[in-house]
């Protein structure tokens, strides 16, 4: 079954919180959009999503260009970059504006973004970027 066809096995409005840690860093755009819609469906109104990404903001782009990040992101795709084009789901980085847009299209709002250490090479709360959202 393609990821875009998977229906979460829970009823509508089942959860107050969804954790998607190191999930979206392995999903291609269509699957990512579908999973966000499924997350919205299974969250109660006001429910939260805590998710992680590799975000290609200015600092992320600079880190990738330095060649010092892991994963490396070298193969362009629509809205982002892949770590390995032969194994696309091995690692995916996305443009933050697109992530905010698809959250909104799925009926979720982004409430907070925390920068990950993958691009700062400093101490921090998470290796990957954290995106916190809410079901409106």
Question: What is the predicted role of each segment?
Answer:
Residues 19:
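A conserved beta-strand element that flanks and buttresses the S-adenosyl-L-methionine
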Residues 1-9, 29, 33-34, 48-136:
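Class I (Rossmann-like) S-adenosyl-L-methionine-dependent methyltransferase catalytic domain
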Residues 23:
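Conserved sequence/active-site signature of Rossmann-fold short-chain dehydrogenase/reductase
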Residues 15-16:
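Local beta-strand N-terminus motif with an aromatic residue
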Residues 33-45:
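A short glycine-rich, Lys/Arg-flanked "PGG" loop and its adjoining helix->strand segment in the class I
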């Amino acid at each position: 079954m393609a990821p875009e066809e998977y229906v979460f096995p829970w009823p509508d409005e089942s959860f107050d919180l969804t954790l998607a840690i190191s999930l979206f860093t392995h999903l291609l755009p269509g699957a990512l959009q579908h999973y966000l819609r499924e997350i919205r469906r299974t969250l109660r109104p006001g429910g939260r999503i805590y998710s992680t990404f590799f975000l290609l903001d200015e600092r992320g782009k600079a880190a990738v260009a330095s060649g010092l990040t892991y994963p490396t992101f070298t193969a362009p795709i629509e809205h982002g970059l892949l770590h390995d084009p032969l194994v696309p789901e091995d690692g995916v980085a996305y443009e933050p504006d697109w992530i905010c847009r698809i959250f909104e299209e799925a009926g979720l709002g982004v409430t907070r973004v925390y920068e990950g250490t993958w691009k700062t090479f400093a101490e921090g709360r998470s290796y990957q970027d954290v995106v916190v959202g809410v079901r409106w």
